[in-house]
Amino acid sequence: DSINLSDELQLDFYSNSSVVTAVRHLIKERRLDTAVNKPEALYVSLTDMVHKNRLVIPFFNEHDVIEFYQTRTVLNKDHKIKPKYLGKVNAEKTLFNIDRVSSDHDCVYIFEGPINAFFTKNSVAVAGITERGKSFTQRQEEQLNTTLKYYDKTWILDSQWVDQASLV
């Protein structure tokens, strides 16, 4: 039931939707549509019970299959009552943008959030770091130890983790 925000026919069909308009505004305002490392498409759902009215960011795996997704609040009324980010229910997190890592580069940049990774070539994101220092799911560990094994890794964490980064 997701609307592909890169598909002009779908955008035309939903042109009167205030939610689609709000999501498109966020994409333009944050320059997500012109980012160097953006995914092929972004989505929005108008009906999903959990992810309704949220920007949907797909996580493609090494085989170009959507294995996970994260959603972000868009509407002002939701900012104070709903979590800013939610992941796919009952699914193990994967690395965002691992499908876009290129062997033309020696280094891969690892961000906390996927939107940060939109703006740097050869970057991935872990989609959140826990307070207890357990940062990765088993699947993410697997991706780090196989697909990204031979890359130099540069970690770029959000500021709340600066003092704790050396402890992880």
Residue locations for each model-derived region?
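Residue-level preference for nonpolar/small residues embedded in alpha-helices
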Residues: S18-V19, E112, Q164
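A sequence-composition feature that detects small, non-aromatic residues
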Residues: A22, A35, A41, A91, ...
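Compositionally biased non-globular segments, especially hydrophobic aliphatic-rich helices
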Residues: V44, S123, G128-T130, V162, ...
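Intrinsically disordered, low-complexity Ser/Thr/Pro-rich tracts
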Residues: L144, L167-V168
